[in-house]
Amino acid sequence: MKYSELAGLYRRLEKTTLKTLKTRFVADFLKNVPDELLEIVPYLILGKVFPDWDERELGVGEKLLIKAVSIATGVPEGEIENSIKDTGDLGESIALAVKKKKQKSFFSQPLTIKRVYDTFVKVAESQGEGSQDRKMKYLANLFMDAQPEEAKYIARTVLGTMRTGVAEGILRDAIAEAFKVKAELVERAYMLTSDFGYVTKVAKLEGNEGLSKVRIQVGKPVRPMLAQNAASVKDALLEMGGEAAFEIKYDGARVQVHKDGDRVVIYSRRLENVTRSIPEIVEAVRSQLRPEKAIVEGELVAVGDGGKPRPFQYVLRRFRRKYNIEEMIERIPLELNLFDVLYVDGESLVDTPFMERRKRLEEAVEESERIKLAQQLVTKKAEEAEEFYRRALELGHEGLMAKRLDSVYEPGNRGKKWLKIKPTMEDLDLVIIGAEWGEGRRAHLLGSFLVAAYDQHRGEFVPVGKVGSGFTDEDLAEFTKMLKPLIVREEGKYVEIEPRVVIQVTYQEIQKSPKYESGFALRFPRYVALREDKSPEEADTIERISELYGLQERFKAKR
């Protein structure tokens, strides 16, 4: 299958904002994809090469890409860089450079999707001495044979800036439409495996029956079950039917641990493979998780003086560290608090009631300094739960989780079977969709960021406020560098930004407001932290903001 066909799909997707049209375009394309490409193409449509949980990365920056294009076309690097300043779009500028190509390869052949993908794999797997030169050579060979439109989208895929507006929801619906299968079965299979390539292949070759048989696989992360908020311990008990399992809500990073013999893989909440950054936890899992094969979930907490928990950002620092890891083990010790088990030695436990899963977890784990079971209290008495809550806060934890005793594990679902109880209104995780250039000494920096939540009815991110406080100059420099490649449009000082970056925002209250299409606005929003552990799909939704608004009004009424 020619790559030009995929490039044509990208073009059509870029030209429409309608979700229904995008879904139809993707569905029509998938119908014609040969079986051997079914596991590759869904990721390319999303503007990716590999699933999020795959360790491989292309490791190519803008400068290396420009060099590769210059070698392929004979157009000087400086000319390409000046063109980028004029167009504001690296992909467009690379297409222009390919148009001016000064040498034509005598042996040039049309690019195929397989050749482009195989080249991306070679680029990702080039490591060690001379790897940058090899990456450049592989890409230059692609650009030599690429047409301008193909070059534009190859460049965007390499840099992860596709801008077609296709996210997981559109791809899910397109798979269902293309192969006449139920969208809910596609969703379920994806939530269990986090692998659109595998799900697409099953949908086409095995239909609804095959999708309904999809099971958890060790080595492929399961989408995490999520919780809603409760206003109080009493409200949580009432919602749970009078009895609940209360667990400490740790201020850490949620992880999913996959064990297959001596092979241990640990995924972050965002499904990124963080195994290499936390070797001491890997070793502890090998020795303390008894089953031969298992999938367990827990909260990774950074431990400070006297065993007190440190803010979750310390855990993220561990995740980011690629070198001198031994030093970081000493500086930021970690503790894994396990709270669930999803799979044990060939048996999926997602449909098993929660208390039975807890029993299986206790049987599976040998506790130590590194690995512990989440502290739990099962009770019908509000006063016992209140005392447990008070102790959790005194120890420096965030609050409590309340869980229905009979609840099954629902991957990717945020329902009322799990509830969070915290003493203050919860911060929001929002996506940056716009920004303004600063003034004076900050004129070269982006600031005053427009933040948005996802509106499931509209199928798009809608703004809920502007965040301009809480940033240091270093923060603004980092955000400017991060967001510049994601700028879609500029109008005066304002820039529209592709929704890719998630930040944690605190605020005084949520207000009803006609100012934004969402109907909500944050009062006095303030930046707290970059949420590298969350993808845009995991950010808070308008539905969630509406739920928090209702909780807020109930708090006010009780005063």
Curated annotation (Swiss-Prot):
This is DNA ligase. It comes from the Archaea. SUPFAM superfamilies: ATP-dependent DNA ligase DNA-binding domain, DNA ligase/mRNA capping enzyme, catalytic domain, Nucleic acid-binding proteins. It is an enzyme of class 6 (ligase). PANTHER family: DNA LIGASE, DNA LIGASE 1/3 FAMILY MEMBER. It comes from Thermococcus fumicolans. Keywords: ATP-binding, Cell cycle, Cell division, DNA damage, DNA recombination, DNA repair, DNA replication, Ligase, Magnesium, Metal-binding, NAD, Nucleotide-binding. Belongs to the ATP-dependent DNA ligase family. Its cofactor is Mg(2+). DNA ligase that seals nicks in double-stranded DNA during DNA replication, DNA recombination and DNA repair. Shows high activity with either ATP or NAD(+). GO terms for biological process: cell division; DNA biosynthetic process; DNA recombination; DNA repair; lagging strand elongation. It catalyses: ATP + (deoxyribonucleotide)n-3'-hydroxyl + 5'-phospho-(deoxyribonucleotide)m = (deoxyribonucleotide)n+m + AMP + diphosphate; NAD(+) + (deoxyribonucleotide)n-3'-hydroxyl + 5'-phospho-(deoxyribonucleotide)m = (deoxyribonucleotide)n+m + AMP + beta-nicotinamide D-nucleotide. ATP binds at residues 247, 254, 269, 299, 339, 414, 420. The active site is at 249 (n6-amp-lysine intermediate). GO terms for molecular function: ATP binding; DNA binding; DNA ligase (ATP) activity; metal ion binding. Its EC number is 6.5.1.6. HAMAP family: DNA_ligase (MF_00407). Pfam families: DNA_ligase_A_C (PF04679), DNA_ligase_A_M (PF01068), DNA_ligase_A_N (PF04675). Transmembrane segments: none annotated. Optimum pH is 7.0. Optimum temperature is 65 degrees Celsius. Loses half of its activity in 15 minutes at 90 degrees Celsius.
